[in-house]
Amino acid sequence: MRHPTAVVVSCLKKWFVGSEYEKVHVATKVPANIHGPVVRVDSAPPNRETPITDRTRIMLQAYGDDDQDCVDLLAACLDGLEMAYRADVAVMAWETDTEPYNFPDPDRPGVVRWQAAGTLWTALS
């Protein structure tokens, strides 16, 4: 069983293929030097909801040049996660519950960061 963040990273990379976001760096860690837009995928611990499913709170952080770029990138991520069941058989459902909001990074004051979040349900088998 893969960790839910690995599932989300994989789904977003597949979703971005052929789009303006194809070259966006999507990962669970932010590079020391940010060059271009970045999406960081983070999570709370998975919660075993049933014997065969996990429910996980997923947070998406978009780093970009300005507010609009980050909002647009997060909107693309949220759209991709709505369709994630097509990209990975482990995905059962996605529900966005927090639309993009400004989320400054205290370690990188010169970089714009926004965050959005939701819940991912995954199959264990």
Task: For every predicted segment, state its role.
Residues 82-125:
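Acidic-leaning, charged glycine-interspersed low-complexity segments
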Residues 1-9, 55-67, 82:
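Short N-terminal helix-initiation segments at or just after the protein's N-terminus
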Residues 53-66, 70, 112-122:
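Oligomerization/assembly interface segments of phage tail-like spikes and tubes
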Residues 29, 44-46, 65-67, 121-125:
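Generic structural motif
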Residues 33-35, 50-54, 108-114:
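A generic structural micro-feature
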Residues 1-50, 84, 88-89:
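Small/polar-rich, solvent-exposed N-terminal microdomains that initiate assembly or binding
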Residues 14-15, 60, 74:
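Residue-level detection of beta-strand scaffold positions
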Residues 64-86:
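Mid-chain, well-packed structural core segment of small domains
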